[in-house]
Amino acid sequence: MLFRSVETAEATQQSLTEAMVGRSISLAIERPEVEQKDELLRVQGLTCINAEGVSAVRDVSFTAYGGEILGIAGVAGSGQKELCEAIAGLYHVKEGTVEFKAGTGFENIVGCKPDEIFKKGVSLAFVPEDRLGMGLVGSLDMVDNMLIRSYKNNKGPLVDRKTPKQVCDELIEALEIVTPGTSTPVRRLSGGNVQKVLLGREIHYNPKVLMVAYPVRGLDINSSFKIYDLLNEQKKKGVAVLFVGEDLDVLMEISDRIMVLCGGAVSGIVDPRTATKEDVGLLMVHAGGEKEAKA
């Protein structure tokens, strides 16, 4: 059904967006000012080798703080995927440390399996790029996907399905997830709703560090802005949010700092309030030299 047609010369980004969603909408992405809290994640000298024997991550060092969104930018294949998986304990680390705040100190999780990381008291939530391959099991419903994350907390031989069912009902209402019900396999949901299920499950467990990889890829405008709002809510709660993105406009608006990767290495860390897209673009091809902004 044709909603509206306009002359190219008369079209604007705002008017086209409103025509697509059928209502007036603001395209501004909020960046709430939140006082940065303690260091929650320290990565030092991280190096990872891929299956071809090539360094996918090369001597990466950075710190993430509570109450900030650290954007991670780079040309596709610059080590973003491997870096995220190494931080989550899912990728072999050749050298370096990945330390999370746990209790009164820091725990290095390099060499630990995911369940060992959990036992160390590390509070990490990871929303991977592959939503239905790594993040969720498409053939399972919301409740079972929630249980995958929480079953180890279950006491006794019987699995409690009532509590996760209640949580799923709450997530459906709070995140405006469009689904026939909690018993529907998640693969039948739209991309935006799948992402809401995945992100909703992860933030339900109140992580200290939230890492999201391309969270709005393929989503419509309404779903994208809902995701941005959720990330900002976590930031306000004092969570350290790592946001791997491919849209520089979005990263420049929502991030407190942007770390740029080039060839698996950090080419610079900039403050988007003072840096330009051109600055970030040059760092993505390592043509701008080292540039750093202290938090």
Where in the sequence are the language-model features?
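Glycine-rich phosphate-binding loops of nucleotide-dependent enzymes
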Residues: 1-295
